[in-house]
C-alpha cells in the first residue's frame, strides 16, 4: 500500500481485522497510512459477498491485489473450515467482483506450500503441484485453479505469486522470527522443529513487495506457444500466469537462528522437536521466470533482513 500511494495511485484497502493474531499490530500497521488522502479503508470480510460487491461497485478499481487469507499451515490442521471460508469462498467473491467490474489485472498471493509432497528442488512453477500436505496449501492451489477458470471463461488476466517464507518488519506474530525474537529476549527457550534441519527460502518483505509491483504493472497474457498435448503448469493459452517469489537461496534453520542471535546480541536456548504434521523439510524457489520476464530477483540477505526486523521489533515493543 505504501509503495502504491508513494507513486501516486489511489488505494482501497480491505481487512476484516480478525483476532487470529493481536489486532493491535494490525491497527498500528494501518495507522501509517490511514490518513493519506488517496487511501480508503474498508473493514469488511471477503466472505461477506454483498460487502465485496458493494466495494467493487462503489470504488471501481482498475487493478486488484489480493493478499488477504487465513494464513498458517499449522492452524489449518486445527481449523480447516476457516481456510475454506476465507481462502476459497472469499477468493470467489474477489473473482466475481473482478468479473463484473472490468478489472484490468488480478494479482493474488499463492504460496510455496502448494509444492506439498514435491521433493525435487529448486521448486519450479513448471512442476506438477497436485499433492498438497495441508488444507492451507490446498486452498492456495484452489485459488490458482479458480483463477484459471475465470481467465478462461471471462478473459480476466490473473497472476498468482507463490511467496516463499516471507519475513520482516510488521510481520505476523505467529511466524517463527517473531516467536523466536520474543522468546530470546524473555530468556525463554525456542521451539526448533525438525531438530533445526529445516531449510527455508526466507524472503524479505521489501523483495516481495517489489515482485508484486512489477507483476501488477504487467497484466498476464496468454502463452501463444502453450501446447495442450504437453501442458505447461505455469502458463496457459488464456491470460493466466503463476510465478515464484523467493530468495533462491535456502538457509538452514540453525543458521537463521544464528543470524537472529547475532542481531539480538543474545544466545537462544533451543528445544529441539520433530517435524510437525503438514510441514515440509525444505523450500527452495526457482525464480528463472521472474528474472526472465520482469528482470527481477529478490536479493536481501538473511543477515540484513533479520537486522532490519530486530531494529523494528525493538522500536515497536520498546525493548
Region roles according to the model:
Residues 170:
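Conserved GTPase G-domain signal focused on the G5
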Residues 3, 184-319:
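C-terminal substrate-binding subdomain of Rossmann-fold SDR/epimerase-dehydratase oxidoreductases
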Residues 92, 96, 145-148, 181-182, ...:
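A cross-family signal for key residues in well-ordered alpha-helices
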Residues 1-166, 216, 296, 308, ...:
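N-terminal Rossmann-like NAD(P)+-binding domain of SDR-like oxidoreductases, especially those catalyzing
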Residues 142, 146, 150, 180, ...:
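Hydrophobic alpha-helix immediately C-terminal to the catalytic Tyr-X-X-X-Lys motif of short-chain
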Amino acid at each position: 500500500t505504501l509503495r502504491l500511494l508513494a507513486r501516486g495511485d489511489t488505494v482501497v484497502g480491505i481487512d476484516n481485522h480478525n483476532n487470529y493474531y493481536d489486532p493491535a499490530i494490525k491497527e498500528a500497521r494501518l495507522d501509517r497510512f490511514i490518513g493519506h488522502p488517496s487511501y480508503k479503508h474498508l473493514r469488511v470480510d471477503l466472505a461477506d459477498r454483498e460487502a465485496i460487491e458493494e466495494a467493487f461497485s462503489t470504488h471501481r478499481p482498475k487493478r486488484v491485489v489480493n493478499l488477504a487469507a487465513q494464513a498458517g499451515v499449522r492452524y489449518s490442521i486445527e481449523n480447516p473450515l476457516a481456510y475454506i471460508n476465507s481462502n476459497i469462498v472469499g477468493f470467489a467473491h474477489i473473482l466475481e467482483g473482478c468479473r463484473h467490474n472490468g478489472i484490468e489485472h488480478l494479482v493474488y498471493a499463492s504460496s510455496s506450500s502448494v509444492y506439498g509432497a514435491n521433493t525435487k528442488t529448486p521448486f519450479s512453477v513448471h512442476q506438477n503441484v497436485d499433492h498438497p500436505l495441508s488444507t492451507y496449501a490446498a486452498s492456495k492451489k484452489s485459488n490458482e485453479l479458480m483463477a484459471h477458470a475465470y481467465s478462461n471463461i471471462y478473459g480476466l488476466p490473473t497472476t498468482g505469486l507463490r511467496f516463499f517464507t516471507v519475513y520482516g518488519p510488521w510481520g505476523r506474530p505467529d511466524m517463527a522470527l517473531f516467536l523466536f525474537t520474543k522468546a530470546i529476549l524473555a530468556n525463554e527457550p525456542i521451539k526448533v522443529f525438525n531438530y533445526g534441519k529445516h531449510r527455508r527460502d526466507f524472503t524479505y518483505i521489501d523483495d516481495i513487495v517489489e515482485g508484486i509491483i512489477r507483476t501488477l504493472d504487467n497484466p498476464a497474457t496468454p502463452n501463444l506457444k502453450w501446447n495442450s498435448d504437453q501442458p505447461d503448469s505455469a502458463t496457459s493459452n488464456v491470460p493466466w500466469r503463476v510465478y515464484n517469489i523467493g530468495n533462491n537461496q535456502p538457509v538452514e534453520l540453525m543458521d537463521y537462528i544464528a543470524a537472529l542471535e547475532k542481531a539480538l546480541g543474545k544466545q537462544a536456548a533451543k528445544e529441539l522437536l520433530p517435524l510437525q504434521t503438514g510441514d515440509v523439510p525444505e523450500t527452495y524457489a526457482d525464480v528463472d521466470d521472474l528474472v526472465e520476464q520482469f528482470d527481477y530477483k529478490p536479493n536481501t540477505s538473511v543477515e540484513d533482513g533479520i537486522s532490519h526486523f530486530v531494529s523494528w521489533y525493538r522500536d515497536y515493543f520498546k525493548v
